[in-house]
Amino acid sequence: MMEEGRKEEPEERGEKSTMRDLLQRAVDKGHLTAREALDRWTLEDHGPPVHHVKLGRSNTVSIAECARGYRPCRGRRPARRPPIRRHPSFWGTLRGLVSEAQRRQEDRMSDLENRMAELEERFEDLALVDSGGKNPAAPAQSVSPPSSNPFAYSLSHFSKSKRVDCGEKGNRWGRPGAFPGAGISELDWIESGDGGDERPKGGRYPRGGNTPS
């Protein structure tokens, strides 16, 4: 039995080689394309012919493989790129650019640190100002609101602004009301302490009355 099996192997190999040669000749003569030859090989159930049947000129993998001659079909492979060889001066130029960028970054950081130190000094000067706004030790240029009440400066500013009362009726804060459509003073609103949601939008009363409805 073993001998019979061994005898059958060469015959099968011969059949396979004959089929392969016939298909290869048909491809070489142009009677069949490589794809048709592969399909016939698969239909005849002779195994995968990818590594045995040579592709025709129309289905070549690359020009380089055509120049080298016959090679089995192994699919499309990207060509290997040669390693990039840089000129020696390239690395020196690159180091110079990197060092220059680092130097610029250090200069920017030093400028920012100096600016922060200057702002800290000014903040310390502002903190030295007492609640009355008088401090002989503080420099003359440092004019700022007191640290105890940050709204004192805005209150003093609005208190100096001129108020014009154009109406006789009193509004809900006990002050003479303005004519319809006139703006409300910011100082009146801050000193009143009344509901913030009830203030008209844009600081103005609706036309037709001194007080909001």
Swiss-Prot record:
Residues 1-20, 165-213 are annotated as: Disordered. Phosphorylated. It is found in: Host nucleus, Host nucleolus; Host cytoplasm. Keywords: Coiled coil, Host cytoplasm, Host nucleus, mRNA transport, Phosphoprotein, RNA-binding, Transport. The RNA-binding motif binds to the RRE present in incompletely spliced viral pre-mRNAs. This region also contains the NLS which mediates nuclear localization. These overlapping functions prevent Rev bound to RRE from undesirable return to the nucleus. When Rev binds the RRE, the NLS becomes masked while the NES remains accessible. Escorts unspliced or incompletely spliced viral pre-mRNAs (late transcripts) out of the nucleus of infected cells. These pre-mRNAs carry a recognition sequence called Rev responsive element (RRE) located in the env gene, that is not present in fully spliced viral mRNAs (early transcripts). This function is essential since most viral proteins are translated from unspliced or partially spliced pre-mRNAs which cannot exit the nucleus by the pathway used by fully processed cellular mRNAs. This is Protein Rev. The lineage of its organism: Viruses, Riboviria, Pararnavirae, Artverviricota, Revtraviricetes.
